Regions:
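Asp-box/WD-like beta-propeller blade repeats and closely related beta-sheet repeat scaffolds
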Residues: 167-201
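Extracellular mucin-like PTS domains
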Residues: 46-67
Length: 405
């Protein structure tokens, strides 16, 4: 072993691995090495203290997770800038991404996407009776989920091809195509041609409201155990909310309607309904008395068939039922779709309820006492009206969708 050059010779410590004894000596040698670094190799250095070097951490490279592209997502769209050909677009609805969805009575849901119209989905429906005569059946309602940004649900109401039932159906939008179709609600549909209702809308409470006509069974409108002649309220999945006014198993929200064919929700949550009045019903006027309810009441009982128009009795009295806010009296207008217009919308309609009529075009409602009044709007507003994300009005008739800024 090496000897220090300036010190007295020290006895060498010999470390040899010789079996168990050798291992013991090795341990002893290591112990000596800790106490005096001169053993088993290098000579000790005066006043030196061994400082252990901490282990150096080795960085493990990490890879950030790669987001999976959503193949169903659609980039933000611009609404249509002009007139769109559309065969009998019964109802219009904008999605939060700017796309315009519209339902054609013959059974196609269409969407304006990337500057062109495409078919989103179709339903098996009919628009005439079995003998080819007039009918109010068809694809009649359309609504966009209030949580569309996350669930992409689109809802529709239609009469089935067998003329025996009506349905609320739901799809999931995937890049402009309806997938995962699911029928949520089914209602019996009588043999009568007309008074089918068929409009749907989401309230500010997130619930789905459905309008049903009384199918020429006037007494059904006052029977809260019968869905006809009613405004019905459901959860988005088609179940009944427990806080409905007539109990947790009853979908009825309001009753006493002949054929409610327009429903609109205001910014403050109030719900308006347009209702087609008597037109040739036995014992009632032959024309007129279409009505508007500006703010639907929870559990509200309205006048049909006890009264029509501004509380004109049909036989007896009105039985304390609620009168409408506006009536066409002895003039038939045939009200259809309705919309509340935002305060930043077109000046002539801002802050008002507007509704289409098949007979006279758009009517603009001004609340008043004792009754509301109406003024005329675009004559093309025959089927439906909606306010676009650009604050323009979009209206439809039997052949086109129009834009009014």
């Amino acid at each position: 072993m090496a000897r220090p050059q300036s010190r007295a010779q020290r006895p060498a410590t010999v470390c040899q691995p010789l079996g168990v004894a050798g291992h013991i000596r090795l341990i002893a040698c290591l112990a000596v090495a800790v106490a005096a670094t001169g053993a088993c190799g290098s000579p000790p250095v005066a006043s030196a203290t061994a400082t252990p070097t901490p282990p150096t951490a080795t960085a493990t490279p990490t890879t950030a997770p790669t987001a999976t592209p959503d193949r169903c997502a659609v980039a933000q769209q611009s609404p249509p800038s002009g007139t769109i050909p559309a065969a009998f677009a019964t109802v219009l609805a904008f999605a939060p991404d700017g796309r315009l969805f519209y339902a054609q009575r013959s059974g196609a849901v269409r969407v304006w996407q990337n500057g062109a119209a495409r078919t989103f989905a179709t339903v098996p429906t009919v628009t005439t009776e079995s003998n080819g005569s007039y009918s109010e059946r068809g694809l009649l309602g359309l609504a966009i989920s209030p949580t569309f940004a996350s669930d992409r649900f689109v809802y529709a109401f239609y009469s089935d091809a067998n003329r025996t039932q009506q349905h609320v159906i739901r799809w999931r939008d995937c890049a402009g195509t309806g997938v995962a179709a699911k029928v949520l609600l089914t209602f019996p549909s009588g043999s009568d041609c007309c008074h089918k209702g068929g409009r749907i809308a989401f309230g500010h409470d997130g619930m789905l409201y459905v309008t049903l006509g009384e199918e020429h069974q006037a007494s059904a409108a006052q029977n809260t155990s019968d869905p006809r002649g009613k405004i019905l309220r459901y959860r988005p999945d088609g179940t009944i909310p427990p806080d409905n006014p007539f109990g947790p198993s009853d979908p009825v929200w309001a009753y006493g309607f002949r054929n409610p064919f327009g429903i609109a929700v205001a910014a403050d949550g109030q719900i308006a309904v347009t209702n087609n009045g008597p037109s040739g019903d036995a014992g009632s006027p032959s024309t007129g008395y279409d009505t508007v309810i500006l703010s639907l009441s929870r559990g509200g009982g309205y006048q049909w068939p006890y009264c029509y128009g501004y509380s004109h009795p049909l036989g007896g009295g009105c039985n304390g039922r609620r009168p409408p806010d506006w009536s066409s009296e002895n003039s038939t207008v045939i009200p259809t779709g309705a919309a509340f217009i935002d305060a930043s919308g077109p000046a002539a309609y801002a802050g008002h309820l507007v509704f289409c009529t098949y007979g006279r075009g758009m009517l603009v409602v001004t609340p008043g006492s004792p009754h509301a009044t109406v003024s005329a709007g675009p004559s093309q507003c025959r089927l439906d009206v909606v306010e676009g994300p650009d604050r323009a009005l979009y209206v439809s008739d039997a052949g086109h969708i129009y834009r009014f800024a």
